[in-house]
Design a protein with these regions (language model features):
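Solvent-exposed, conformationally flexible loop/turn segments
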Residues: 356, 382-384, 534-539, 544
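A broad, low-specificity signal marking well-ordered, structured residues that form hydrophobic/aromatic
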Residues: 191, 341, 347, 394, ...
Length: 552
């Protein structure tokens, strides 16, 4: 009830939510040595009916990821059964299982390098977790570091090996099994697996995060560097425990700044075990809740852009949060930067990460034009600028050539809502391109062609042309299209959609009331275009050509 109440409160506060990562307290049961956390068991006082719990969360549009660990306490009720099946890493000098330190005492550790063990673990996962109604798993504490004797022996597919040699593969295999178990339990369902650790290739099976971080300002900065480094290593689907995991509760300013950075992380999760008996919640400081609400809602507006970047990472391995030295390899000054990053190819993010900051210095890479996301103020690259900031500031810059699709409607839950319209922010200083990706988000149908890729190409010039070409059979939810085209020099002469000139409005209110047309915003120095989504290949032409006033 406390968890469903938390989700309901989040919705009442107007804060979007889609997932809940269920910590291992759900499997804290009464044993001979007191309350202990035993994987694949349920505390029936806290969860009288696990199946109903998952059903209630699904009804609220929330995906639950239960915590699963590979260590088995010596007082675990299933220990002897697992031991008899030979599921554990063996001691270095005997045929008995090796023993190491675990949560709440001594424990044995599952050997995932054995096919028989993998099959048994998969069945236990299905029977004790997935069959209750979740297609998500949170694999945790799978580094095997607490096995002090690194000569403990693993099967290694019958060839033999030591845990010292093989511990790095355990988390990858554990996540692979989790994916297989979901596919075997649910028809046509996309697994969602989260894992704290892994070696090269973990991105094939799981989303990862930067571990149990300390709640402090330094961690905020270090976590950004960690995520950027993981992106350079091919692990794009990454994040951190926002607000800090361990320590006293975050002060208000730190929490706001962490969330403002977290909205750009592929994995956004506020997660804590505060030592002052508090819980980190987005509304814990009432005077800051609006800043937090605004930031998280902005993440949901960016969903079409982020989801497309996720698909790009899936296909190519390219980062979502990209280090400046990677995005601008020919600019030596970008090799000195460890906090700013590119969010995709089009957005430069310069979060405020210093306590009490009143200004923020930002280096803009040379050879590019950048625009303030909010004011559209232009800046030439190759210079450091200094901006005034307050607690609500999230400094963002649009790179010349940018194409950034955003949701026109404000969604608060992606399981129950979809983008009704797409608004594309673009900056035609130069040519640009972007692939907008859509699918149902939950099934495996995308493997059968049930997706929609819209290849958007922009040719800049006196006649700026945006061409939309589609691939795939997915039926989009998008009914309206809008363009927000930065063009400070002058307004257009005319705008066409598929060769047909659309109405020009001189008054903003009349433009807003119309279904189709264009308007030039003097405030933003931007061309605003909107039209019904043709749901097919089409072209938009915006003419900035000189025209004859007498001829008008």
């Amino acid at each position: 009830d406390a968890i469903t109440e938390f989700i309901d409160t989040t919705k009442e506060e107007g804060i979007p939510v889609d997932g809940f990562q269920l910590s291992s307290g759900y499997c804290a049961i009464e044993t001979e040595e007191g309350i202990k956390r035993c994987v694949f068991t349920w505390n029936k006082k806290r969860f009288k009916d696990p199946k109903d719990f998952f059903a209630q969360m699904k009804k609220r549009g929330v995906c639950v990821s239960p915590n699963v660990k590979p260590g088995i306490l010596l007082i675990h009720p299933k220990l002897e059964e697992m031991k008899a099946k030979g599921m554990f890493v063996k001691a270095s000098e005997t045929e008995e299982p090796g023993i190491g330190t675990w949560w709440g005492g001594q424990g044995m550790f599952v050997d995932f390098t054995s096919q028989e063990t993998r099959d048994n673990w998969k069945e236990m996962l299905k029977e004790n977790v997935l069959n209750y109604g979740t297609s998500s798993v949170w694999n945790d504490n799978c580094e095997y570091d607490s096995m002090v004797d690194k000569d403990c022996r693993c099967s290694f597919e019958g060839k033999g090996g030591t845990i010292g040699q093989l511990k790095s593969v355990m988390s990858n295999i554990m996540c692979q099994i989790s994916n297989e178990a979901v596919h075997e339990t649910f028809d046509n369902t996309r697994p969602y697996v989260v894992c704290r650790s892994g070696h090269a290739g973990i991105q094939r099976y799981a989303q990862t995060w930067a571990g149990d971080n300390l709640t402090c300002w330094d961690s905020l900065k270090y976590n950004i560097a960690t995520i950027l480094g993981m992106g350079l290593s091919g692990v794009a689907n990454q994040g951190c425990d926002i607000g800090g995991f361990y320590g006293v509760s975050p002060e208000a300013e730190l929490l706001v700044r962490w969330i403002q950075n977290g909205i750009f992380q592929p994995r956004f999760s506020i997660h804590s075990t505060n030592i002052d008996n508090t819980v980190t919640e987005p509304w814990m400081y009432s005077n800051c809740t609006e800043y937090i609400r605004t930031a998280i809602k902005f993440r949901y507006r960016l969903f079409p852009y982020l989801y497309s970047l996720m698909e790009r990472a899936h296909e190519t391995g390219l980062p979502i949060m990209e280090a400046m030295c990677s995005a601008f390899q020919n600019d030596p000054k970008c090799y000195e930067e460890g906090v700013d990053f590119m969010f995709g190819d089009s957005l430069l993010v310069a979060n405020v990460v210093e306590k009490g900051a009143k200004t923020r210095k930002v280096y803009l890479p040379e050879g590019n034009t950048f625009y303030d996301f909010y004011t559209r103020t232009p800046y030439n690259g190759g210079q450091t600028i200094e901006l005034p900031v307050d607690l609500g500031s999230i400094p963002l810059f649009v790179k010349g050539g940018a194409i950034i699709p955003m949701a026109s409607n404000q969604m608060k839950n992606l399981m129950t809502e979809q983008p009704a319209g797409i608004s594309i922010l673009c900056a035609p200083d130069c040519d640009g391109s972007f692939t907008l990706y859509e699918d149902d988000g939950v099934s495996m149908d995308y493997e059968k062609g049930c997706y929609l890729k819209t290849f958007v190409s922009m040719t800049a010039g006196e006649r700026t042309v945006l061409t939309f070409k589609q691939e795939g059979s997915y039926a989009t939810s998008v009914e309206t299209m809008a363009l927000d085209m930065i063009h400070r020099e002058k307004a257009p002469y005319w705008v066409t959609v598929d060769g047909k000139e659309i109405p020009h409005f001189l008054h903003r209110r009349k433009f807003e009331e119309a279904e189709c047309g264009w308007y030039y915003s003097q405030t933003l120095k931007s061309v605003q275009v909107k039209y019904l989504n043709p749901k097919k290949d089409h072209q938009v032409v915006v003419s900035f050509e000189q025209f004859d006033l007498i001829g008008m």
